[in-house]
Amino acid sequence: MKIAYVVSSKKKCGPNIVILNIVKELANKHEMEIFFLDESDDDVFECVNVKSTQIKKASDLKEHLKRFDIIHSSGIRPDALVVLCKVIYRVKCKIITTIHNYVFQDLYYSYGLVKSLIGGLLWCSIWLFFDKLVILSKNADNYYWFLPSAKKNIIYNGIDDNDCLQNKKCNYRKEFNIPDDGILAGSCANLTKRKGIDLVIQTLTKEHKIYYIVAGNGIEKHNLINLVKARKLHERVYFIDFLDEPESFMSQLDVFLMPSRSEGFGLTVLESTKLGIPVITSNIPIFMELFDQMCLTFDIKNPSTLIDVITYAKKNRLHLSQKFHAIFQDRFTSSKMATKYENVYNNLFREVL
């Protein structure tokens, strides 16, 4: 098969990591090429021997896509361009997209009610033209009840389960003078309201021996810093910039926190579990489905419960990390994910013949 991937850019982000892991697993079996729209400082695909081509306009993409059997896009602009090529330019291939979010919730937390409704309806309309839609969970399948059932496939995300831990570039306990008996918690996120970092900050006090490091940037970062100042937690909560390789940071934590109000999947949960770090998530439905018995949870409507859960995770770290890692290997490896995507590609390819 000849498979093309169309993405917004080559920067490191959740949807691109999913594409990367599919390519890693299947590139030796199929002809592949990655098309991207925007330049970026980093290139998540540089580790794979697959050609990548920048697209400036839809007509350029049309000429490229004529060579492929399957087109797999990710993101609103790539989705729109692929549909344009399929419907307007009559490119004869099968098209598939992965829906990584809960579109109305996701856009609401970033852009507000009006833009989320307009953007969400537009994006959902675009999805109707695809031959296949990959949904990341049963919960998301129910959320998108209005999309044709025959087009939807549920495939859980997966990550590479090989050991790829880099040398420590920074000792975070030493950097922030965190005592040996302090519990070091952390999160990696694009800092928006949806990620729920404020819930953790509002729960912590100086009386607790819990220290919290937040790795990431985003529109909410300034507000979070001000919240830390208002609660006088500058000796408990610290911010560092987005990390291209977060594994070293995660490996130094006692517990990883994922306090999201809404989430499409949560790849950092898998990354932390792979490293043997216990994970605590909010009890939103998507996490309860995906990570049942693989993570600890706290009540998002009663965030004060988080303190007890963090303390429990620290005391039982060894047992929890072994238990959670075994479940990760059973459910969420990139090889399992890629096999399911390949099955979808094969079914579409038979329709092309």
Curated annotation (Swiss-Prot):
Any one GO cellular component localisation term in the record: Gram-negative-bacterium-type cell wall
Effect of residue 163 to A: No effect on activity or donor specificity
Main location class: membrane
Outcome after substituting residue 263 to A: Loss of glycosyl transferase activity. No activity with UDP-Glc, UDP-GlcNAc, UDP-Gal or UDP-GalNAc as the donor substrate
CDD domains, alphabetized: GT4_PimA-like (cd03801)
Temperature impact on function: Retains 50% of the activity in elution buffer/20% glycerol for four days at 4 degrees Celsius. Retains 60% of the activity in several days storage at -20 degrees Celsius with 20% glycerol.
InterPro entries, sorted: Glyco_trans_1, Glyco_trans_4-like_N
Annotated UDP binding sites: 190, 271
Annotated Gene3D superfamilies: Glycogen Phosphorylase B
Regulation: Activated by 5mM MnCl(2) and MgCl(2). No significant effect on activity by 5 mM ethylenediaminetetraacetic acid (EDTA), 0.125-0.5% Triton X-100 or dithiothreitol (DTT). Inhibited by 5 mM Zn-acetate.
This enzyme's EC code(s): 2.4.1.-
Membrane topology value: Single-pass membrane protein
UniProt effect for mutating residue 194 to C: Lower Glc-transferase activity, but significantly higher GlcNAc-transferase activity compared to wild-type. Very high GlcNAc-transferase activity
Top-level taxon in the UniProt lineage: Bacteria
Phenotypic effect of disruption: Loss of LPS O-antigen production.
Keywords in alphabetical order: Glycosyltransferase, Lipopolysaccharide biosynthesis, Membrane, Transferase, Transmembrane, Transmembrane helix
GO molecular function: alpha-1,4-glucan glucosyltransferase (UDP-glucose donor) activity; glucosyltransferase activity
Pfam families (UniProt xref): Glyco_transf_4, Glycos_transf_1
Subcellular location(s) per record: Membrane
Entry's pH dependence statement: Optimum pH is 7-8. Retains 24% of maximal activity at pH 5 and 14% of activity at pH 9.
Regions that span the bilayer: 116-136
Function text: Involved in the assembly of the O-repeating unit during O-antigen biosynthesis. Glucosyltransferase accountable for the alpha-D-Glc-1,4-beta-D-Gal linkage within the O-antigen. Transfers alpha-1,4-Glc to the Gal moiety of a specific Gal-beta1-3GalNAc-alpha-OPO3-PO3-phenoxyundecyl (Gal-beta1-3GalNAc-PP-PhU) synthetic natural acceptor substrate analog. Requires both Gal-beta1-3GalNAc-alpha and the diphosphate moiety in the acceptor.
Other information: According to PubMed:32421169, the hydrophopic domain of this protein is likely to play a role in stabilizing the association of it with peripheral membrane or possibly, with the hydrophobic moiety of the acceptor substrate. However, a transmembrane domain is predicted by a program.
Name of the protein: O-antigen biosynthesis glycosyltransferase WclY
Organism lineage: Bacteria, Pseudomonadati, Pseudomonadota, Gammaproteobacteria, Enterobacterales
Gene coding for it: wclY
